[in-house]
Amino acid sequence: KWFIDQVRARFNEKRYQYVDLAGFYWIAEDASHTGNIITPIANYLNELKYSFNWIPFFNSDGHESWKELGFHYAYYQPNYYFDDKIPLTRLDEACKEALRCNMQMEMEFEDDVLAAHGKAYRLENYMAKFKEYGVWEKCRLAYYQSNNALLTLKYSSEPADVALYHKFCKFVIERPIRDSH
């Protein structure tokens, strides 16, 4: 409670004109060691009318019981992008599991998304699979893009990178479901 109260107080002191404190994010990516404190925190945030969000990793402990733990939204991490040895079927499995558990999804990519690094196809695969399974049109999406991946794509001198940047932006802005929280 102390931490939440401190964040709220410091945020309110700033009197931001165009930014709202809409909710809180639980940083632990599984529920193995924190499960007993999540629900009381969720209850407190509910009293304060804040959203409580979680992004568990693929097949993590507790991902199926995210609602029972008290989260408003859980965004399932496919963890597909990072390791080239992980097959495309991981995205199929992740999409099916997220839909089965009524979860949202996370799209992941990093600064090595540039064509020169040979990983652009993995971001392309996320976009294709999210559309194939209806995630793009039915689910909220969280985006993990490392440090500067979008800027790196946008300002690349390689036309394929800039094209991927525009394709990704179009993917985001044309989604049927878009709201702030």
Q: Residue spans of the language-model regions?
A:
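An active-site-proximal structural segment forming one wall of the substrate-binding cleft
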Residues: K1-D20, K129-F130
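Aromatic-lined carbohydrate-recognition surfaces of secreted/lumenal glycan-active proteins
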Residues: K1-I4, D20-D30, A42-H63, M107-E108
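Alpha-helical scaffolding within the catalytic cores
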Residues: I4-N12, F57-W66, I86-A94
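Surface-exposed amphipathic alpha-helices with a cationic face
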Residues: R8, I38-S51, C95-L99
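Aromatic- and acid-rich polysaccharide-binding/catalytic face
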Residues: Q17-E29, H63, K67-K85
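Beta-propeller domains
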Residues: A31-S32, N36-I38
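Substrate-binding cleft of secreted/luminal carbohydrate-active enzymes
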Residues: N59, F71-H181
